[in-house]
């Protein structure tokens, strides 16, 4: 079995569980923060949905450079918006995983901020750590 198939099987199962949790997020309490340094509930829900988009950055690019400052959090206004974001990004991850070569998982990928490199590791390790384990973390 290919690594991409293993990743997709795991993501598919986790995505179903994540979707159920996102559907239960009380967005009328979206401003709630358990601590002043915490994300708001709404921002955390969007973050969890957006993690499914990281497959694109991981497998179709060779680095993520924060100095480019091109990230803007998605604005959602309803549970339907949140679930649509989640579903769209999971479908895109499925497409990417169905098309990626096995060789791509061995290529190096870096997270950086301009000249400062936080880490470089094979894309397969990045996918496991940041696309799956980070999702479980939340």
Residue ranges and their predicted role:
Residues 99-115:
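Acidic catalytic patch
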Residues 1-8:
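Basic/polar N-terminal segments that are highly enriched at the extreme N-terminus
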Residues 2, 77, 88, 126, ...:
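Short, conserved clusters of charged catalytic residues that mark active-site
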Residues 57, 62-101:
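Helix-adjacent hinge/juxtasegments
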Residues 8-23, 27-72, 111-138:
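Short, contiguous alpha-helical
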């Amino acid at each position: 079995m290919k690594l991409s198939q293993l990743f997709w099987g795991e993501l598919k199962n986790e995505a179903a569980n994540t979707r159920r949790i996102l559907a239960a997020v009380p967005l009328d309490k979206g401003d709630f923060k358990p601590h002043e340094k915490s994300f708001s509930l709404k921002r955390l829900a969007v973050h969890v949905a957006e993690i499914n988009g990281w497959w694109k950055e991981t497998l179709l690019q060779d680095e993520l450079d924060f100095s480019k400052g091109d990230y803007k959090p998605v604005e959602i206004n309803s549970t339907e918006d949140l679930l649509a974001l989640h579903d769209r990004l999971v479908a895109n991850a499925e497409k990417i995983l169905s098309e990626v070569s096995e060789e791509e998982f061995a290529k190096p990928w870096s997270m950086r901020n301009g000249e400062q490199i936080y880490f470089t590791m094979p894309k397969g390790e990045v996918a496991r750590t940041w696309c799956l384990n980070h999702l479980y973390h939340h």
